[in-house]
């Protein structure tokens, strides 16, 4: 049975409506909700001469910014005070999704990249990587 719904939130203004839809789903199924933003290093961000320290600094800055964007969801009353907000970092998408503590019966929800027309049902590159590496079932909501 469904134990919790986690919403993957990239922190963009156009993705807030996906969070709102997941809030409604969590209420409908009477399960707790969590919102996660993934901060992933990905491939080498800079030439080797720059060093990993610069990449670590940029990743840490992005994670801090993501925490602010998540907090804004509560400030704007998009989500309730009981919703868990989390930033998860990783060197790649597999590592980031493995770093999450998943419950048995959990569902991961994410939105598509809104580009109009039929593109609304297609995932962007980040969404596709999340689906590929997710250890739990994924619900894809049209953006």
Cite the ranges covered by each PLM segment.
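Small/aliphatic-rich secondary-structure junction motif
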Residues: 2-56, 60, 76, 80-86, ...
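Short, well-ordered secondary-structure micro-motifs
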Residues: 18, 45-49, 95-99, 120-122
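Active-site phosphate/pyrophosphate- and oxyanion-stabilizing loops and adjacent acidic/basic residues
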Residues: 23, 71, 75, 128
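Short hydrophobic/charged patches on amphipathic alpha-helices used for structural packing
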Residues: 27, 94-98, 128
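Short secondary-structure boundary segments
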Residues: 37, 111-113, 142-143
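Short, surface-exposed alpha-helical segments at coil->helix boundaries
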Residues: 56, 60-71
